Structures are given as C-alpha cells and as structure tokens.
Amino acid sequence: MSFIKEFREFAMRGNVVDLAVGVIIGAAFGKIVSSLVADIIMPPLGLLIGGIDFKQFAFTLREAQGDIPAVVMHYGVFIQNVFDFVIVAFAIFMAIKLINKLNRKKEEPTEAPAPTTEEVLLSEIRDLLKEQNNRS
C-alpha cells in the first residue's frame, strides 16, 4: 500500500474527520464565549463593583527602566480568562448532558433468562431436601 493511499485512508476515517470538525467548531465557539465574557458579562460586572475594567487590573513587579519594559502581572486578564473557562466548561457539560440524554435508549424490560440445566437440577435437589426435612 502506498504511503499516500495509507494516509488518505487514515485521514478519512470517521474518528479523524469528526475530531477535525470538533476542533474547528470548538475554536469558533471559544471566540464566541470570549466575546460573551469580554463584551457582555464583564462590563456590567465591572459597573457593579464601581466601574472597574477587569483588563486594567495589574500588578507591576518592576517599573520600566530606559529601554527595558516594565514587568507586569495582568491578573485582570486572568480573571477574565477564568470566566471564559467556566462558561466553556458549563456549555460543554450541558452539551454532553444533552447528547447523553438523546443517546440513552429506553430500556425495555427484559425477561429473566431461562434457568440453566444446572440451576434446574439444583432447585430440584433443594426442593427434595426440604421435603425430607419436613417429613422428619
């Protein structure tokens, strides 16, 4: 089998194609969630706590000196990314819950399987022993 043919078969398998579609949709969904957090959720939240923009929260470790830029920890951006993560995680959780619910087949009551020959014989022996004990 040629290398190209083998690669084509690998790439066209259902799992690989499904994964590729999932990654592309996931990336697009991530952009939507980031916009939701940055443009919809964070501004009112900042307004509620005094008109603060979370992106501006930062802690300067070292001031800029000449050509050397300042060393700054932007923890406001981190807080915003935590909100992104929580929303994405919740959305994925809800999607998986929905998929599991749709995939769950109604369990039909199954009849008890017929007893095996061994079980039938053991039941007969048990019944005979009970009869003998009751006679005594």
From Swiss-Prot:
InterPro entries: Mechanosensitive_channel_CS (IPR019823), MS_channel (IPR001185), MSC/AndL (IPR037673), MscL_channel (IPR036019). Pfam families: MscL. The chain crosses the membrane at residues 10-30, 76-96. The keyword RNA-binding does not apply. It is a multi-pass membrane protein. It is found in: Cell inner membrane. Its main location: membrane. PROSITE patterns: MSCL (PS01327). One of its GO terms (molecular function) is mechanosensitive monoatomic ion channel activity. SUPFAM superfamilies: Gated mechanosensitive channel. The keyword DNA damage does not apply. Keywords: Cell inner membrane, Cell membrane, Ion channel, Ion transport, Membrane, Transmembrane, Transmembrane helix, Transport. GO terms for cellular component: plasma membrane. Channel that opens in response to stretch forces in the membrane lipid bilayer. May participate in the regulation of osmotic pressure changes within the cell. Belongs to the MscL family. Homopentamer. This is Large-conductance mechanosensitive channel. It comes from Citrobacter koseri (strain ATCC BAA-895 / CDC 4225-83 / SGSC4696).
